[in-house]
């Protein structure tokens, strides 16, 4: 039994002293629970745990069985993923490379691409967010919890409990080390993925329900929007509020940063959206035109600019305004007036109004290739819009109740270097990685749906 003794293990042990102590206690708990009295006594003596008394409420209680079960689950998941990878490799090998690349880049959800319906929340699911690296997704719910799932397998992973009222939004940082959540309980919580998803920070300062929360690119700051009519910017490392943005006359439904972190776009019950300068905290432009509450506002990705310029009959070679960053030129908004609007965030002009939904528009997401806009609505559908023409190209009956949110996967997939052709030089550049093809939608029907090719 000497191998159990923390003092006799090699000096380069991968376990810290705290981890060794926890391991010893969990093994002792297992021995005691299973009446292995001799082994219990030997380990207690050799591991210097003479005062150990089993406690069913302690962290180590039942830990050995939990870890063992987790290992089995992980092994099963690895086998499933290896099988899936093998299947995909066979499919890829059978497809011509040019056609394969085009089809992957142009994929869009269809009714037939609903892969998983994940159930577990007890009240409506409000928002979903993808992990930036792994096949994990977080869901926020009115049942006061955040749940984590594996979207590849559809398996539930864990529940994050701590909020006392409805959780309104959820987000990952750029590396997937932290999860953010915000709630009607007036708080924002930070959960540490590397520390068993412990709630390591709770940010308080809003005077009413917190409806939106996001990491700013770079992960040094957090932005939140609230029913108290304000937007707040928080320093992540300290949890201090560094700036409060005021201007909306009513509930601020969301505040989303541009990819370069220079701008925010917010939307409100006051029927407007606003673009803000993050550094100064000033409103850059107010977007007026909707006839009801604006539920969602997002920046268009640079990849969509050419299509939007064509949609609005703008000069494709027109130089952008010097005050506009490359990442904040166009905005899409969705409203309870059942319409989606595309805006020029420099002039504040509405470039196009997309009509087709039969109820409130609740969520928007651009396709990575910039050719399409996806929307979800209280009419229970997901709609796909061609950005060059403004036409609805597909309507999918997505849920059995109001659809509340939509997200496109964040993870990147490295593209293979194409084989050399005659006369080509060796060592050609690695093609740009593409965003994984997966979409998630959330609903009042208590489910999260995963859509994949």
UniProtKB/Swiss-Prot annotation:
Pfam families: LisH_PAC1 (PF24951), WD40 (PF00400). WD repeats lie at residues 120-161, 162-201, 205-244, 247-286, 314-355, 356-395, 413-452. GO terms for molecular function: dynein complex binding; microtubule plus-end binding. One of its GO terms (cellular component) is kinetochore. GO terms for biological process: cell division; establishment of mitotic spindle orientation; microtubule organizing center organization; microtubule sliding; nuclear migration; vesicle transport along microtubule. Residues 19-51 form the LisH domain. It is found in: Cytoplasm, Cytoskeleton; Cytoplasm, Cytoskeleton, Spindle pole. Residues 69-96 form a coiled coil. InterPro entries: Coatomer_complex_subunit, Dynein_regulator_LIS1, G-protein_beta_WD-40_rep, LIS1_N, LisH, PAC1-like_LisH-like_dom, WD40/YVTN_repeat-like_dom_sf, WD40_repeat_CS. It comes from the Eukaryota. Its main location: cytoplasm. The keyword Electron transport does not apply. Keywords: Cell cycle, Cell division, Coiled coil, Cytoplasm, Cytoskeleton, Microtubule, Mitosis, Repeat, Transport, WD repeat. SUPFAM superfamilies: Lissencephaly-1 protein (Lis-1, PAF-AH alpha) N-terminal domain, WD40 repeat-like. The keyword Cell membrane does not apply. Dimerization mediated by the LisH domain may be required to activate dynein. Belongs to the WD repeat LIS1/nudF family. Self-associates. Interacts with NDL1 and dynein. HAMAP family: lis1. Positively regulates the activity of the minus-end directed microtubule motor protein dynein. May enhance dynein-mediated microtubule sliding by targeting dynein to the microtubule plus end. Required for nuclear migration during vegetative growth as well as development. Required for localization of dynein to the mitotic spindle poles. Recruits additional proteins to the dynein complex at SPBs. Required for retrograde early endosome (EE) transport from the hyphal tip. This is Nuclear distribution protein PAC1. The gene is PAC1.
């Amino acid at each position: 039994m000497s191998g159990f003794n923390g003092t006799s293990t090699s000096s380069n042990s991968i376990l810290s002293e705290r981890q060794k102590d926890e391991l010893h206690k969990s093994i002792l708990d297992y021995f005691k629970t299973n009446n292995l009295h001799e082994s219990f006594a030997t380990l207690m003596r050799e591991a210097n745990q003479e005062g150990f008394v089993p406690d069913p409420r302690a962290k180590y209680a039942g830990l050995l069985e939990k870890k063992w079960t987790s290992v089995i689950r992980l092994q099963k998941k690895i086998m499933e993923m290896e099988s899936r990878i093998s299947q995909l490799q066979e499919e890829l090998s059978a497809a011509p490379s040019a056609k394969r690349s085009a089809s992957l880049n142009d994929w869009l959800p269809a009714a037939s691409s609903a892969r998983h319906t994940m159930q577990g929340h007890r009240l409506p699911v409000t928002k979903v967010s993808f992990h930036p690296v792994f096949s994990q997704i977080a869901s926020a719910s009115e049942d006061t919890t955040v749940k984590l799932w594996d979207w590849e397998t559809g398996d539930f992973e864990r529940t994050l409990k701590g909020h006392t009222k409805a959780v309104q939004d959820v987000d990952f940082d750029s590396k997937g080390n932290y999860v953010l959540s915000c709630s009607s309980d007036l708080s924002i919580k930070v959960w540490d993925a590397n520390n068993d998803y412990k709630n390591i920070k709770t940010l308080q300062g809003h005077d009413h329900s917190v409806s939106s929360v996001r990491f700013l690119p770079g992960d040094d700051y957090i932005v939140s929007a609230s029913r108290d009519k304000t937007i707040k910017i928080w320093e992540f490392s300290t949890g201090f509020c560094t700036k409060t943005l005021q201007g909306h006359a009513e509930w601020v439904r969301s505040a989303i940063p541009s990819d370069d972190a220079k701008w925010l776009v917010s939307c409100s019950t006051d029927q407007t959206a606003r673009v803000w300068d993050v550094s100064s905290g000033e409103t850059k432009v107010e977007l007026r035109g909707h006839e009801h509450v604006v539920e969602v506002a997002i920046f268009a990705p640079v990849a969509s600019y050419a299509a939007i310029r064509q949609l609005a009959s703008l000069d494709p070679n027109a130089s952008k305004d010097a005050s506009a960053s490359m990442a904040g030129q166009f905005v899409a908004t969705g409203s309870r007036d059942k319409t989606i609007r595309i805006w020029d965030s420099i002039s504040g002009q509405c470039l196009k109004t997309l009509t087709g939904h039969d109820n409130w528009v609740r969520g928007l997401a651009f396709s990575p290739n910039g050719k399409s806009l996806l929307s979800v609505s209280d009419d229970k559908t997901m709609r796909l819009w061609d950005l060059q023409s403004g036409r609805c190209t597909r309507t999918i009956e997505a849920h059995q109740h109001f659809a509340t949110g939509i997200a496109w996967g964040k993870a990147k997939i490295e593209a293979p270097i194409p084989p050399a052709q005659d006369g080509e030089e060796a060592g050609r550049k690695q093609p740009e990685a593409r965003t994984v093809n997966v979409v998630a939608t959330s609903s009042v029907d208590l489910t999260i749906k995963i859509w994949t090719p």
